[in-house]
Design a protein with these regions (language model features):
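Active-site region of glycoside hydrolase catalytic domains
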Residues: 1-185
Length: 185
């Protein structure tokens, strides 16, 4: 819960509830700004929809003194790849941080709906990367079964969330065109 408070609550709790999550206040104290009543009123419920970029989910464990970057040290959490039992969260894509976890999106959509009064949600980016294999033939590149499986799984999770009553209004796939913005602005 602490990790999701820092990931989503940091932005959404002030809009919906007028303040940061308690777990953030406990760890960051006066480093977090406070909102006046006028500011709270100005931002409260002033949201038309949530745009959600989602690529992966991670396993998180409590660590008193995590070795990871400062952001995780403050949260006292650490990202882990597998439980002690050896169970992994999902298959890894090309990036070390990206695992294929369709059920994670389903769980997140239901969490957002429950905590934030079922706002309209547009999944503004969802997808995976793959290794850049210059030796692959066109036939091999077009036989992209991992990506097909990724989208089938994630779209099925979105469909299930909609059946659960989550107000998902749109879904956009992460494509090669999205990455032009990094180099070509």
């Amino acid at each position: 819960q602490r990790r999701i408070d820092f990931q989503f609550g940091w932005f959404l709790d002030p809009i919906y509830f007028g303040d940061y999550p308690e777990s953030m206040r406990e760890r960051l104290g006066s480093d977090l700004p406070t909102f006046s009543e006028k500011e709270k009123e100005f931002i409260r419920n002033k949201i038309d929809f949530i745009g959600l970029n989602h690529y992966t989910s991670r396993l998180i464990a409590h660590r008193q003194n995590p070795e990871d970057v400062y952001f995780y040290q403050v949260q006292q959490v650490e990202r882990i790849e597998k439980w002690n039992s050896g169970e992994k969260i999902g298959e890894r894509a090309a990036s070390e941080w990206l695992f294929i976890v369709p059920w994670g999106l389903h769980k997140l959509l239901n969490y957002i709906a429950k905590k934030y009064d079922n706002p309209a949600i547009y999944i503004t980016e969802n997808g995976m990367d793959e290794e850049d294999d210059q030796s692959a033939t066109l036939e091999q590149v077009l036989n992209d079964t991992t990506r097909v499986g990724y989208f089938k799984g994630y779209l099925a999770s979105v469909a299930q969330a909609i059946k659960d009553g989550v107000d998902v209004r749109g879904y956009f796939a992460w494509s090669f065109l999205d990455n032009f913005e990094w180099a070509m602005g």
